A protein has these predicted regions:
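Acidic, Gly/Pro-rich loop/turn segments at junctions of secondary structure
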Residues: 75-169
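Central regulatory/effector-binding core of bacterial HTH transcription factors
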Residues: 40-103
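All-alpha effector-binding/dimerization core of bacterial HTH-type transcriptional repressors
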Residues: 38-41, 47-49, 54-59, 111, ...
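Alpha-helical "hinge/linker" immediately C-terminal to small N-terminal DNA-binding modules
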Residues: 11-34
Length: 203
């Protein structure tokens, strides 16, 4: 600080300036804090179709109420989109992570169930061993989907059956409807088939 008068006036002037500077800094910190604490901008999310319809889409209006300055773009796809190429900020996936360079966090387990309609099993018989599936009508996702790997435990040893159905669909709900209508055997997440098992529509 410049000091052209007596020492007492110089100190008083210096203190006043210091207080103003500190006040300006406090205001700046408060402004930055308010921006930081209020998320804003564009959020691009991708998630599988069936999970999105049941567990994400119904809650988006609540999210918008909580964060009105966040613009949400939801890409619903059963394909594993490349996050970098598609400029995706957040991906929710029901599968094992294949790219270890991505930052991931497990949200929950996803138990799956192999199911068929009672009428189909009455007609074709119930498979006892994974090898029996080769003799059955399989409803699967399209080729290359990670959901086509059906995992079993046989004599305490893991066994994988790669599903390749004569009926291949790219949508979980479409597979579910085909299975309910006696189309064959499928494997879907329990959150998809649970209520149908409970009602006896699937077994």
């Amino acid at each position: 600080f410049g000091c052209l008068v007596g020492s007492e006036m110089c100190i008083r002037d210096s203190l006043d300036r210091a207080r103003r500077i500190i006040g300006d800094v406090d205001e700046a910190e408060a402004a930055v804090s308010s921006v930081t604490n209020a998320p804003r901008g564009h959020l691009r999310i991708t998630a599988p179709s069936t999970f999105s319809y049941r567990h994400i889409s119904p809650h988006l209006p609540i999210f918008r109420e909580m964060y009105p300055d966040v613009e949400v773009e939801m890409i619903i796809s059963d394909n594993e989109l490349n996050l970098v190429e598609n400029n995706i900020d957040l991906a929710i996936r029901i599968a094992l992570m294949r790219d270890s360079s991505l930052i991931s966090r497990k949200l929950a387990s996803n138990p799956r169930a192999m199911v068929a309609s009672p009428d189909y099993l009455k007609k074709k018989g119930k498979p006892i061993h994974p090898d029996d599936l080769d003799k059955h009508d399989i409803i699967s996702f399209q080729l290359g989907s990670p959901y086509n790997e059906w995992h079993f435990l046989v004599d305490n040893k893991p066994k994988v059956f790669t599903a390749k159905g004569m009926l291949q669909l790219n949508h979980g709900d479409a597979i579910l409807r085909s299975c309910i209508n006696n189309g064959g055997i499928c494997m879907l997440s329990r959150f998809v088939v649970g209520r149908h098992i409970a009602s006896g529509t699937l077994t």
